[in-house]
Amino acid sequence: LHWSERRATRAAQKTPTNWEDLCERAFIRMAYRIKEEDVPSPLYINSDQTQVVYAQGAALTWSKTGSKQVSTVGNDEKRAFTIVVSISCDGTVLPFQTIHQGYTKKSCPTLTSQSYDQCIKANFRFEYSKTQTYWSTQETMRTLVDEIIAPYFETKKQELGLPPTQKSLWQIDLWSVHRSDEFRTWLKKTHPTIMIDYVPGGCTGL
């Protein structure tokens, strides 16, 4: 049949042509803030969000050798949720936040869901977006800070014997909600000791 194993075709994220310069500048800015504010490694957090597909399709199939366009069953599955993962520079993994499409708690995992109790004990946060998407919103980002990021920073400051005024550094990507004036203004007013730092656009995977 002249078939061979082929990977489904899809557009890859484009890396900026000046990515090295962007990353170097980001590194210098971060190093400066860490030095000037005496930020210890436990008080530096990196957070990232990613899509988790409920029923992941296969990326490989059999197709005619030399095919330019290859389709697979389930590869375009859109039913998914967002998971926000945070880790500190000293290796501490913070509780996860998940965001589910919908307007009520029924959109989130139920009490009888597999491993639900373990997730709750680990302080996971199950959020519904109150929108028709499962991406982060102003409200879910504020919950992330109020319930996960800020409490972690405050606990670590106490453990390290540092004053409440000690600055901490939080690195996130350039998602539109993250960089919005609304969120930045809220964070500065509500959590003035948390400094925000952005991963250059298109460089998250580097």
Regions found by a protein language model. Give the residues of each.
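Phosphate-facing sequence motifs and polybasic nucleic-acid/acidic-lipid-binding regions
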Residues: 1-206
